[in-house]
Amino acid sequence: MNEESPPILWVFAGPNGAGKTTLFNDMLRGDIPYVNADEIAHELDPASGGIDALRAGRLAVERRNAMVSRRESLSIETTLSGSSALAFMRKAKATGYHISLAYVGIDTPELSRARIDERVVEGGHDVPQDAVLRRHPDSLRRLARAMEIADSSLVFDNSGLERRLLLQVENGIVSFIDDHRPAWFEAAVSRRFWYSD
């Protein structure tokens, strides 16, 4: 990276089970450090299936804050179910980071649950049902705010067999990529985007 290029923060966001880690692996694995609490939990205790989520979450926050203080590019994963990810995006932007958002949405909390159950069968981590039910609508509710903070955004739907890119925002230019806009997308994305293309 040359001296004029700002560091980059990639934010991979979406409800539990939506496919955030898979999207990161498809887009950037090996290109940029990925601070992911689920992977940290697995590193702490591989045999437990990553059950030490609280400790892993604290370590993830420490790692990403340290990287921002050193102005290193990084990527994070978040459900956007709380305000901490938005605050971190604002903090990074205020220190000169370029913020890129990649959001993966899915239709329902029930689909989240089904995807999580598949992941558990394959040895991945579980998420409590009450958290799944709470985080799905909370994530969608914060999507528009995350897009307003980000310098560029990609919004995907992963409700079907294949992930579809729905919307891209780059340099203030909004491009609708797919004419089929699922109900979750219409409800979550700020109406100001509808009239920008």
Predicted regions and their residues:
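NTP-dependent small-molecule kinase module
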Residues: 145-197
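Glycine-rich phosphate-binding loop used to anchor ATP phosphates in small-molecule kinases
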Residues: 52-106, 136-139, 146-147, 154
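Pre-Walker A (Motif I) flank of P-loop NTPase domains
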Residues: 3-10, 70-72
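Conserved substrate/cofactor phosphate-moiety recognition/catalytic segment
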Residues: 23-72
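Conserved nucleotide-binding/hydrolysis micro-motifs of P-loop NTPases
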Residues: 39-41, 81, 105-111, 160-162
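A glycine- and Lys/Arg-enriched "phosphate-lid" helix/loop adjacent to the NTP-binding pocket
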Residues: 97-145
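The conserved Walker
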Residues: 15-16
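Conserved lysine of the Walker
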Residues: 20
